[in-house]
């Protein structure tokens, strides 16, 4: 069964939150952060929030999908795009620009549900990555799978780009360490 089909099947089975409520709530959080701090700090805060979500979301993902360990980082990218995004956000970005060494890929989002109903103020267009929470979620989830990654936005429709793109780069595979006394 294809990854896209598995993502679709799992999405149909899980409890859902009203998409508009989710998008509007996220927008309210970002708006409040923008009032409280500068855009660079907002980007950091959204990434941190996403990271904390990602380290918990991966457990839910694995429980719902019973997904086996991926053979390589490219397969991980395809799983994130075709299954992970589909299960939790009901869309599947396109994976592209896979590096020759297989340690980097780009996720292209034609539709970003977080960006619905959003128009950035002119002063935010060069500094704010509105959906930066997604980078944090990817980073947190993959870290729980022993992958230390960078996830950064390259382009954003809200900044006037044609597509939204996130580059994910594998820095290193983390070693599983057993806590002292748990041998």
Curated annotation (Swiss-Prot):
InterPro entries: Bet3 (IPR016721), NO_sig/Golgi_transp_ligand-bd (IPR024096), TRAPP_component (IPR007194). It holds the Pfam family TRAPP. A lipid is attached at residue 70 (S-palmitoyl cysteine). GO terms for biological process: endoplasmic reticulum to Golgi vesicle-mediated transport; intra-Golgi vesicle-mediated transport; intracellular protein transport; macroautophagy. It is found in: Cytoplasm; Golgi apparatus, cis-Golgi network; Endoplasmic reticulum. Its main location: cytoplasm. Keywords: Cytoplasm, Endoplasmic reticulum, ER-Golgi transport, Golgi apparatus, Lipoprotein, Palmitate, Transport. One of its GO terms (cellular component) is cytosol. Belongs to the TRAPP small subunits family. BET3 subfamily. PANTHER family: TRAFFICKING PROTEIN PARTICLE COMPLEX SUBUNIT 3. This is Transport protein particle subunit bet3.
